[in-house]
Amino acid sequence: MVLAAPLLLGFLLLALELRPRGEAAEGPAAAAAAAAAAAGVGGERSSRPAPSAAPEPDGCPVCVWRQHSRELRLESIKSQILSKLRLKEAPNISREVVKQLLPKAPPLQQILDLHDFQGDALQPEDFLEEDEYHATTETVISMAQETDPAVQTDGSPLCCHFHFSPKVMFTKVLKAQLWVYLRPVPRPATVYLQILRLKPLTGEGTAGGGGGGRRHIRIRSLKIELHSRSGHWQSIDFKQVLHSWFRQPQSNWGIEINAFDPSGTDLAVTSLGPGAEGLHPFMELRVLENTKRSRRNLGLDCDEHSSESRCCRYPLTVDFEAFGWDWIIAPKRYKANYCSGQCEYMFMQKYPHTHLVQQANPRGSAGPCCTPTKMSPINMLYFNDKQQIIYGKIPGMVVDRCGCS
């Protein structure tokens, strides 16, 4: 019995020595550390000390992590904006002062129109990246085609309908011109050119009757002085009409073109038959194509009602007015998003070497954290501390994708 007591004590000490040392680090504190890392930008982990674990609402531990991640993300956004704008503190400009300063400032509508301010608009599920491979469209020439029978009376007018592909209709039109060839005149003359928008026949008129079923809506009228005995190409600004067609494609039934001289002769070449080759009306467009293409988002996307426990991207709207930051002119709010969730060792990490190190020494590291793996900038129009209006682009303010790293 005397020898058994020291032997039993030795076994107990050996069991304590062989107990896994990483078990004490797991639990609520580790979860809080993961939430703090999720609030960082570009995978950087926050140096903020991990707070004490909050009580779990309705037995939902992931809800606690998620709420803590939201709070850390909002505080991180505030400090990042001030830091990236090189401001020591938020400019002390109230809403009343902003109202007084804005009318004295240069016209801001042009800046708001030219630059994309991410505000209340919904963000697409897939992030956009620059397309550096495909050719971009700059100029589009659309030749006149025959009109639909629904807008014809006794087979007239046959011209002109212009067809545009969906790709062109989703571009930004910088300039649109309609080109019409006018026949030569024997002597100088004044020509009255008019363009009428066509609409389908109504129930009151028929193809052979005089019920006036087809409605003409005048959209352009020009007075042209012709002095040359040779033919003349006349261009007409058509951008406004084109915008209307692109917004409502069903309203594009075509147009009718007339150019009458004093004797009533129509000088506009609108015939699509033989003898008028190369003289048909056409539309010239200068467009700015969106060079960004959609790419499949490899990270998980969740909403606030999701029960997902893995690393996921959640929606978060930043409201500058709620902050009391009236010095920001635009946007007043934007969708920032945040990362939250657990990262298990069994999942491959962002960098292969990280995964290998953790596999070789699983107890020797703090473990992977759910952090942003791709971020994008926002444009901002704001007052600085000298009450000057500044336009700038702030990088890394929108979480596009989350991952474990």
From Swiss-Prot:
Location relative to the cell: Secreted
UniProt-recorded Gene Ontology molecular function terms: cytokine activity; growth factor activity
UniProt key word RNA-binding: no
Domain of life: Eukaryota
Entry annotated with the keyword Glycoprotein: yes
Residue numbers marked as site, Cleavage: G119, D120, R296
PROSITE patterns: TGF_BETA_1, TGF_BETA_2
Entry function: Secreted signal that acts globally to regulate anterior/posterior axial patterning during development. May play critical roles in patterning both mesodermal and neural tissues. It is required for proper vertebral patterning and orofacial development. Signals through activin receptors type-2, ACVR2A and ACVR2B, and activin receptors type-1, ACVR1B, ACVR1C and TGFBR1 leading to the phosphorylation of SMAD2 and SMAD3.
Subunit record text: Homodimer; disulfide-linked. Interacts directly with ACVR2B. Interacts directly with ACVR2A. Interacts with ACVR1B, TGFBR1 and ACVR1C in an ACVR2B-dependent manner. Interacts with FST isoform 2/FS288.
The family this protein is said to belong to: Belongs to the TGF-beta family.
Protein name in UniProt: Growth/differentiation factor 11
